[in-house]
Amino acid sequence: MRAVLLAGAVFLSLSYPFAAVPAERSNPAGNPPIEILAPAEGAAVPPGKVLVIGRVKPGTASGVEIDVNGAVHQKAIASNGGFMASVYLTRGRNVLSVHADGMRVERRVVASETVTYRYHPEAEKCAGCHAEVSRGYVVSGRKDTVCYQCHDRKDGKKLVHGPLGGGDCTTCHDPHGAMNPSLTVASAEGLCVMCHDQPSSGKHLRESRAVGCITCHEPHSSGKEYLQK
């Protein structure tokens, strides 16, 4: 009888399995609920204290956990769409992982004396560019107006480059940090072909690796056609 009861218990446990604990999922493509804005993937940053800046879709989570190489290093409040926290990296390869609401996003960086990633000088002072937190970290005014609080104006000539004329410096520049000089989101030539045809499709007087788009063209504004220098 005892053997029969035991067999029945095993049968019932197999017939009615317990609810599985959902595993963490990686961010979906498109409009991810969690996003790391800085540092960039593959960036080389100084060893030690590193600032992690990110965005969380409003209503997703009230806080995030930031792991470094699998160990929890920091917890941060995710208030109205943004979070910021400092973690400590050891020399060599490091994996940053941000968790919230069952979702996970990772970023691989290298802590090295040879630095390739540059933060915006105001990165740790969100309020310098963003409105108060209760408004969801929106930019406090037109984007270029915020930039001109510190930077010289670049639109003073007759012809103004399209993104700058539209007041959006962030088409070409990352306001948090980047691996390129002047915090551009790509190399100088890479930026141009994001919108323009490849140079090989037009008539250029000279072909040389030493000559790039900005050798002849102004990226902001110019008094000559085609934004020539």
Predicted feature locations:
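Bacterial N-terminal signal peptides
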Residues: 7-16
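Short, compositionally biased P/S/T/A/G/V-rich stretches that sit at domain boundaries
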Residues: 20-45
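Aromatic/hydrophobic beta-strand junction motif of beta-rich domains
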Residues: 51-58
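Short beta-strand segments within Ig-like beta-sandwich modules, predominantly Fibronectin type-III
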Residues: 73-81
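Surface-exposed, short loops/turns at beta-strand junctions within beta-sandwich domains
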Residues: 86-93
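Conserved structural position at the C-terminal beta-strand
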Residues: 98-100
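Inter-heme linker and motif-flanking segments adjacent to c-type heme-binding CXXCH motifs
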Residues: 104-110, 114-120, 127-229
